Design a protein with these regions (language model features):
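Short active-site oxyanion
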Residues: 50-57, 129-133, 181-182
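Loop/turn-to-beta-strand initiation segments
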Residues: 28-30, 99-104, 180-181
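General beta-strand structural signal in soluble alpha/beta enzymes
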Residues: 59, 134-137, 184, 210
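Glycine-rich, flexible N-terminal cofactor/catalytic loop recognition
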Residues: 2-83
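Conserved helicase motor
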Residues: 80-87, 161-164
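Short Gly/Thr/Asp-enriched flexible loops that form oxyanion-binding sites at enzyme active sites
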Residues: 113-129, 195-199
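Class I SAM-dependent methyltransferase SAM-binding "motif I" and its flanking Rossmann-like core
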Residues: 120-178
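A contiguous loop/helix-start segment that scaffolds small-molecule binding in enzyme catalytic cores
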Residues: 4-12, 19, 27, 181, ...
Length: 307
């Protein structure tokens, strides 16, 4: 059940609308405009002001963008701009900018040129000395990162991995020593295979955050170890639906931490000669003071390597 906006919010929105109306939108500029990643009300008032002012919109999918702007009450000429025609579309856009038109550049969802078409258009416009204006807004990678609780030496946006297995596995191996939080996008039909490959590349104990359908009705954010992730995902087919952001915690750079974990691995290797995985993890936790769940994941990895 929805509740009406409070009088305060109504007044505030009217005030913000007046502020937006007073803003200047220079002619002959390309507006790189972020659109919602799922929830329509996540669009900014400034973005709506740009959509009202522009002469045309360069977009990835004209049908999708046409429906989106219609929802906000706009009708604008659309310029098809996707990965197969981006260079040609850039020239059309540059010509219109030189004639003083205002052009918005959007992707299907989120911020353009972030794992989506748009970078070549922006590069071409800047190369010609024309103006590019970013209009801030949603980005699935940043939204997922903010809700992950993972920290490291910054973060590294990877986007989509190669679709071929050998190339994918090679890319993961190249990233395994990175201390940054790694941010990936993945499609539903590949997500289980990708996470299984991540477990093999990064080890069972590394944590992963699986974020799907962000800002939408069935949004789900789940954090666990890579040892647990494939089983969690496979346990419910609904968990494999939608659009995914996958975040992997960075590799430890601390020498003391590495020494502790190396010692724990040696201890677990000995304990597993006589104990079950669970018993070995419990004993190692008492001896080392490390967290039992991480030791369990490490013991499971050692046991898997033996089998």
């Amino acid at each position: 059940m929805t509740s009406p906006l409070s009088p305060y919010l109504v007044t505030l929105l009217k005030s913000l609308a007046e502020d937006a109306a007073a803003q200047r939108f220079p002619a002959g500029a390309l507006y790189v405009l972020a659109t919602p990643i799922g929830n329509l009300v996540d669009i900014s008032i400034r973005a709506l002001g740009v959509l009202e002012q522009v002469d045309a919109i360069a977009c990835e999918d004209t049908r999708h963008t046409g429906q989106l702007i219609k929802r906000y009450g706009f009708s604008k000429p659309l310029i098809s701009t996707h990965q197969h025609n981006e260079a040609a579309a850039a020239q059309k856009i540059i010509e219109r900018l030189r004639n003083g038109d205002r052009i918005a550049l959007v992707s299907d969802a989120g911020t353009p040129a972030i794992s989506d078409p748009g970078a070549r258009v922006v590069d071409a416009v800047l190369t010609q000395g024309l103006t590019v204006v970013p209009i801030a807004g949603p980005s699935a990678a940043v939204v997922a990162l903010s809700a992950s609780g993972l920290s490291g030496e910054g973060f590294q946006f990877v986007g989509f991995l190669p679709t071929k297995q050998a190339q994918r596995d090679s890319a993961l191996q190249a990233l395994k020593e990175s201390a940054a939080v790694l941010v990936f996008y993945e499609a539903p039909h590949r997500v289980l295979d990708t996470i299984t490959a991540m477990r093999e590349a990064f080890g069972h104990q590394r944590r992963i955050v699986i974020a799907r359908e962000l800002s939408k009705l069935f949004e789900q954010i789940h954090r666990c170890s890579l040892s647990e992730a494939p089983a969690w995902l496979a346990a419910d087919t609904d968990r494999q639906r939608g659009e995914f952001v996958l975040l992997i915690e960075g590799a430890s750079r601390g020498g003391q931490d590495n020494e502790q974990f190396n010692e724990a691995r040696r201890l677990l290797t000995l304990l597993l000669d006589e104990c079950s995985v669970s018993q070995a993890a419990a004993l190692a936790a008492k001896i080392t003071g490390l967290k039992k769940n991480k030791l369990y994941a490490m013991a499971l990895e050692i046991a898997d390597q033996r089998s």
